[in-house]
């Protein structure tokens, strides 16, 4: 096996976590920019109706892509565990089983998106003037879903062994292509929402091709060999046991957010458009923080597999500190630069004013989510996924739905709607931390030497 294992199991943790997380954060940002460039281009060159149409799909896009990201988190943890423990055969079986599972998941989600887009958008109470464009955007965008699934698979494998630079490089190429195609399809071809969706789908295919090609050229046990593609029952079960709860958590979050989107849609079209523009900040800030969550799971899993309990707990606290700091700093920057940020997506002053109502509530709340999400990642790094998912479903998702139908229904204001985010994050974080403390104590018991007789 390669000496690259030392990237995660040796050396100063604070420095190593930062160096691994930085390319991950940039990769996450580029993925967000895929959709942001769609919104910016249609808002600038296709009008506010097209902007609202694309923005109305954001929750559904998050639902499906969130499931794939959760699945890839399971792949990341399992490969890291076996790689840290120096079990090359298990790494090989996991990689090839994961490739098959990811491809199948991408195709299934593609079919669901193509067939179910109209019904799901109507369920969200999407405005009638926005509905045709939103349906077109979703159906074309989902053509790239299998490619997105395979890219996330490749990203998870490389990240699990500490190589986060390759995914960043490939996504940079695809991101530049995405922006160029957006401008070409919308300005030159006048394709509006179809053009930006097509640009995203093509770019996702390019990033998937590049990362899969790189995996086939690796000289290590995590290499992808098309001739070895076979579903190993034991590894497939482990991947699904880790990845499906994480994927369902992301999907359930998105489902809960559907109710929030329905609440936004209960206001006039101006507020819907302002919310669509302001919501782009969520992806930028949250995904920068999420890089440290993936690093946390990778470092904890590899060090746990390598028998380094001293580094396991430190990985959690360092990752938590980084993610909280990033959320706080970026949230403050958004608050003070909000109008300029919103102007990237619309030139209408009224839409910018509407968007600032959301920004004023959310800007200083992002950092709170680090205590919830980093703790969930830490539990997954120890192989625990079911209970953290149940806690999230109850503490955040169910709580949010109840909030929408009680607190928001009573006050019916934008602040009353968006205050549910920090409140649900605090509630869930407390429960997740209590569970992690318990399972950490049990997991570390295997490293304690028995007392002398």
Region annotations inferred by a language model:
Residues 46-59, 134, 138, 197, ...:
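Small-residue hotspots at the loop-to-helix junctions and early N-terminal turns
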Residues 33-52, 121-128, 184-191, 251-284, ...:
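Helix-terminus/linker motif at the lipid-water interface of multi-pass membrane proteins
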Residues 1-21, 79-146, 188-244, 300-365, ...:
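Short alpha-helical transmembrane segments in multi-pass integral membrane proteins
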Residues 8-45, 59-74, 78, 103-110, ...:
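N-terminal transmembrane alpha-helices
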Residues 51-111, 148-167, 261, 274-338, ...:
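Small-residue-rich hydrophobic transmembrane alpha-helices
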């Amino acid at each position: 096996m390669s000496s690259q294992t030392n990237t995660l199991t040796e050396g100063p943790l604070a420095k190593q976590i930062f160096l691994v997380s930085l390319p991950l954060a940039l990769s996450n940002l580029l993925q967000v920019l895929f959709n942001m460039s769609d919104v910016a281009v249609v808002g600038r060159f296709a009008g506010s109706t097209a902007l609202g149409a694309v923005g109305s799909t954001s929750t559904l896009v998050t639902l499906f892509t969130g499931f794939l990201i959760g699945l890839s988190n399971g792949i990341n943890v399992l490969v890291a565990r076996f790689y840290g423990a120096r079990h090359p055969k298990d790494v090989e079986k996991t990689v090839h089983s994961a490739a098959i599972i990811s491809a199948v998941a991408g195709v299934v989600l593609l079919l669901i998106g193509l067939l179910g887009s109209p019904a799901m958008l109507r369920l969200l109470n999407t405005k009638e003037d926005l509905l045709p464009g939103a349906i077109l955007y979703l159906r074309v965008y989902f053509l790239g879903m299998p490619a997105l699934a395979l890219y996330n698979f490749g990203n998870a494998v490389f990240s699990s062994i500490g190589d986060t630079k390759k995914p960043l490089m490939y996504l940079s190429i695809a991101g530049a292509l995405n922006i160029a195609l957006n401008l070409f399809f919308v300005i030159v071809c006048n394709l509006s929402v179809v053009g930006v969706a097509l640009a995203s789908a093509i770019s996702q295919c390019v990033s998937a091709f590049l990362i899969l090609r790189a995996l086939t050229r690796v000289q290590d046990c995590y290499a992808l060999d098309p001739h070895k593609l076979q579903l190993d029952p034991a590894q497939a079960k482990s991947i699904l046991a880790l990845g499906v709860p994480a994927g369902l958590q992301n999907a359930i979050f998105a489902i809960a957010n559907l109710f929030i989107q329905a609440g936004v849609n209960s206001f006039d079209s101006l507020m819907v458009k302002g919310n669509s523009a302001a919501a782009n900040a969520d992806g930028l800030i949250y995904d920068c923080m999420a890089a440290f969550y993936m690093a946390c799971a990778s470092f904890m899993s590899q060090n746990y597999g390598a028998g380094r309990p001293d580094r396991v707990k430190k990985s959690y606290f360092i990752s938590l500190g980084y993610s909280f700091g990033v959320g706080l700093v970026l949230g403050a920057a958004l608050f003070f630069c909000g109008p300029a940020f919103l102007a990237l997506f619309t030139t209408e002053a009224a839409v910018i004013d509407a968007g600032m109502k959301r920004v004023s509530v959310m800007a200083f709340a992002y950092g709170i989510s680090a205590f919830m999400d980093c703790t969930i990642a830490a539990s997954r790094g120890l192989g625990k996924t079911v209970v953290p998912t149940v806690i999230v479903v109850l503490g955040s998702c169910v709580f949010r739905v109840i909030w929408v139908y009680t607190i928001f229904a009573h006050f019916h204001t934008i602040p009353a709607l968006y205050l549910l985010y920090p409140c649900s994050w605090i509630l869930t974080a407390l429960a997740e931390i209590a569970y992690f403390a318990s399972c950490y104590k049990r997991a570390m018991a295997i490293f304690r030497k028995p007392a002398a007789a």
